[in-house]
Amino acid sequence: MTVYVLCHGGLGNRLHCLNTALAISKILDTQLVVCWPVTYECGIAFRDVFDTDIEEILATDIQPTHGYVRIGLIPDHITDYPQFKDDLPILLVSVTTSHRFMMSFRNVDVYFSDHKDRPLSDMKEFLETFRFKDEHVNRADEFVQKNSPYATLHIRGTDVPFIQTEMDLMKTTAIQHMILKKGTIRGNLFICSDEKKYEDELVKYYHHAVVRQDKTYPSKRDENLPFLTDKGEYNIFRTSQDVAEAIIDMLIMSRTCQIYGSTYSSLARFAHFIYRHKNPDHTWAFYEHVQHA
């Protein structure tokens, strides 16, 4: 049996899915193959994220001329991976139940990974197998060496309707509460978001706050619509550069012992997994998801 991991959704979902699939492939002592389509949610190629020997297969006939697709909406997209039509037994690892239809293939079993779980594979093994490219690691290292962040405040602004207006941002007490409830932060507070306005505003209100000055931010697919429409459809376009910025943010987060999130963030959770792996004696380190007040 071959273990295929279908990486879809955003970067955080994909990292957790890879982690789960790696663990399963080790347990079964079988080959792991990665399917990493370039999509609106994650516009970076697999080989631009990692230096790895893991095999990758490319989808056929689903990439429009501009190179980006929405996956998971039309079942036929998955069947355009010809390997899934073979008779060889396949275990497909997916991060959501949106590909339940794959279970109808007689040669395919499906395992749905839940990124809320603790990592199934040893993080040491994950980081050795999927080595983040030096260009991302070096930029994160440079920021950490210069700013020495102790804690992270991570705000998702584009695809989660957490803070709708500037006034809401000013009135938010949840963020202030989560900073104070654990006691005084012992060093710099790294503030990161996928919307610049949140970084610009929050850095004014917290002493010892630091932000990355050289990053870019995601853009809208339709400028006339908000990032998240009333119907819940994503109006977001994360280019390769945008995802690279998220990787760097995640790597910086993974150097901080306290991570506060404005919404549930699979990316922040993964950063915390890395920190706990590299600092096993820091039992007081935590990731906390704090709701909007």
Cite the ranges covered by each PLM segment.
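A donor-sugar binding/catalytic signature common to diverse glycosyltransferases
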Residues: 15, 19, 246-291
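Short beta-alpha junction loops
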Residues: 36-42, 195-197, 290-292
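Short, well-ordered alpha-helix to beta-strand connector turns
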Residues: 148, 206, 255-257
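A structural signal for short, well-ordered beta-strand segments and their strand-loop junctions
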Residues: 4, 31-36, 152-154, 190-192, ...
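Secretory-pathway glycan-assembly enzymes, especially type II membrane glycosyltransferases
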Residues: 1-188
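Short, flexible loop segments at the rims of nucleotide/cofactor-binding pockets, characterized by
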Residues: 130-131, 235-241
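Active-site rim elements
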Residues: 5-9, 238-239, 243
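Catalytic donor nucleotide-activated moiety binding site of glycosyltransferases and closely related
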Residues: 155-158, 184-238
